[in-house]
């Protein structure tokens, strides 16, 4: 039985309309192997648009250690994850489990840093700060909080990165989170098969808390998330200047992060922005310029907290703001 540090599970279903993002994810997972011995289990829910084959082949070419499995029918997201979990447990030994949506671009080095926090006491799950792909300077979420009425709130959604704090959320984002494999094994499997999608991550988080485990958000940017792309209508075309800005930002940010900055890539996006502006009458050139400017601040943002000291005790005080922007968290350390 092969041994791995990290098992990454990615579920795919008819992602042709955003397959470029899926490919970038595959490249990011391949980069993860520089920091953690990583196995990718890429599972498809019986797609009919060829996206699975295209993305799986791209993952292999990128150098990922990937096993691609196509299911006989669409089992839904949560059941597909559970199938993948049991499949992996029979074939490999792994210490950590990463659950990643297929509509995000990851920062591999930062994602790998999260693993060390799973060695702190009873911490069983951890996530970093997830940014919005359409508005890359704004947070998608820093985990989620549940209030006394059972309502859930995405922490810091719609706020800039300086909103992000080290704290213990009620549950982690299903889009990008890491767990201790032994903690998941104690639950039997990640999700409840009765929940097809959405709030599966909430249920998982509460189950871990009920077992005496803790969850943690670490304020370091780990991914840019498109959001709900897997559940969009078939044939949906993702376009628009804001979307283009997010794609350019993610591409250039990764290049800068790995000191692989390429002027041909810049030239390609410049040409694409000009052509797209002419064809769609949207200002893609402006979006390109904004993306390039934001890349200049990227390094400072991603290393905002490099060396967080060992956590002895964290007390979270949630200040609830029931607006679409989510909530901010105020932390007291003792």
Feature-to-residue mapping (PLM):
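Short beta-strand-to-loop acidic/aromatic patch adjacent to the donor-nucleotide binding site
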Residues: 93-105
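Glycine-rich, basic loop-to-helix element that forms the pyrophosphate-binding segment
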Residues: 71-89
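Non-catalytic, C-terminal membrane-associated alpha-helical segments of glycosyltransferases
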Residues: 245, 260-334
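A conserved acidic beta->alpha catalytic loop
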Residues: 17, 25, 44-53, 73, ...
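Short, well-formed alpha-helical segments that are part of the catalytic scaffolds
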Residues: 15-32
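Conserved donor NDP-sugar-binding/catalytic core segment of glycosyltransferases
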Residues: 105-146
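A short, conserved alpha-helix in the catalytic core of glycosyltransferases
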Residues: 170-189, 193-222
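Short, flexible, basic/aromatic active-site loop/helix in glycosyltransferases
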Residues: 147-169
């Amino acid at each position: 039985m092969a041994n791995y540090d990290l098992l990454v599970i990615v579920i795919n279903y008819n992602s042709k309309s955003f397959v470029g993002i899926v490919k970038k994810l595959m490249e990011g997972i391949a980069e993860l192997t520089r920091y953690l011995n990583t196995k990718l289990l890429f599972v498809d829910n019986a797609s009919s648009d060829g996206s699975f084959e295209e993305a799986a082949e791209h993952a292999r070419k990128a150098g990922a250690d990937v096993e691609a499995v196509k299911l006989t029918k669409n089992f839904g997201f949560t059941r597909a994850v559970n199938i993948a979990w049991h499949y992996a447990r029979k074939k490999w030994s792994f210490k950590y489990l990463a659950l990643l949506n297929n509509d995000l671009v990851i920062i591999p080095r930062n994602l790998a840093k999260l693993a060390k926090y799973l060695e702190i006491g009873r911490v069983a799950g951890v996530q970093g700060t997830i940014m919005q792909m359409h508005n890359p300077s704004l947070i998608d979420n820093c985990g989620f909080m549940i209030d006394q009425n059972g309502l859930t709130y995405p922490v810091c959604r719609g706020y800039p990165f300086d909103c992000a704090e080290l704290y213990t959320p009620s549950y982690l984002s299903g889009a990008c989170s890491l767990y201790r494999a032994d903690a998941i094994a104690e639950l039997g499997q990640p999700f409840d098969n009765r929940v097809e999608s959405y709030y599966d991550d909430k249920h998982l988080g509460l189950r871990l808390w009920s077992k005496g485990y803790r969850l943690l958000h670490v304020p370091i940017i780990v991914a840019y998330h498109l959001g709900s792309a897997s559940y969009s209508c078939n044939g949906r075309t993702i376009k628009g200047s804001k979307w283009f800005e997010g794609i350019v930002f993610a591409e250039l940010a990764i290049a800068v992060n790995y000191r692989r900055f390429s002027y041909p890539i810049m030239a390609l996006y410049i040409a694409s922005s000009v052509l797209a502006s002419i064809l769609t009458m949207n200002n893609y050139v402006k979006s390109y310029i904004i993306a390039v400017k934001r890349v200049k601040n990227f390094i400072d943002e991603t290393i905002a907290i490099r060396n967080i000291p060992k956590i002895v005790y964290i007390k979270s005080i949630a200040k609830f703001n029931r607006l679409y922007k989510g909530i901010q968290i105020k932390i007291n350390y003792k």
